Amino acid sequence: MAQERRPQRDDRQSREERDSEFVDKLVAINRVAKVVKGGRRFGFAALVVVGDQKGRVGFGHGKAREVPEAIRKATEAAKRELIFVPLRDGRTLHHDVHGRHGAGKVLLRSAKVGTGIIAGGPMRAVFETLGMHDVVAKSTGSSNPYNMVRATFDALKHQVHPKDIAAQRGIKYATLQARRSASGNASEE
């Protein structure tokens, strides 16, 4: 029962190719302490956001005794937890959404072309790795980076593509788009 073994180099190359499609941003790094019998044992905790800049994004948390190891663990955790977010024209949200985690609350609004990413701190990292170019975001409550990232992901998970809304309402997607563009033109006048 001889099994065919693939060369290890090929596995490493495919892993590097897979990793190269992602962009990662370090959001926060904290020094943490574990109290043990002999005193305190120090380590580091890292929060990383990973995305492919095409609508997939994830975040991860990692802890280790050394900073690079904590970042590596957080990056691996983020790649395991990717979500897909439908983007309008590949640059902004389809509709405004609210998100919440703990005491952190965020409001994400779609924006016109050329607006840019108007968001603070941890939210900006999420939008940049997601591939979003135009968005306005406001955070209230907790400014803890962990809560802000989780609240942003909560909001992004509530993002619904207009095709899904049209299917739920039992109307054609083109009809929904026509209504949307008609209401958009009326509000600009």
From Swiss-Prot:
PROSITE patterns: RIBOSOMAL_S5, S5_DSRBD. Residues 22-85 form the S5 DRBM domain. One of its GO terms (biological process) is translation. SUPFAM superfamilies: dsRNA-binding domain-like (SSF54768), Ribosomal protein S5 domain 2-like (SSF54211). GO terms for molecular function: rRNA binding; structural constituent of ribosome. GO terms for cellular component: small ribosomal subunit. It comes from the Bacteria. Keywords: Ribonucleoprotein, Ribosomal protein, RNA-binding, rRNA-binding. Pfam families: Ribosomal_S5 (PF00333), Ribosomal_S5_C (PF03719). The N-terminal domain interacts with the head of the 30S subunit; the C-terminal domain interacts with the body and contacts protein S4. The interaction surface between S4 and S5 is involved in control of translational fidelity. With S4 and S12 plays an important role in translational accuracy. Belongs to the universal ribosomal protein uS5 family. Part of the 30S ribosomal subunit. Contacts proteins S4 and S8. NCBIfam families: rpsE_bact. This is Small ribosomal subunit protein uS5. It comes from Rhizobium johnstonii (strain DSM 114642 / LMG 32736 / 3841) (Rhizobium leguminosarum bv. viciae).
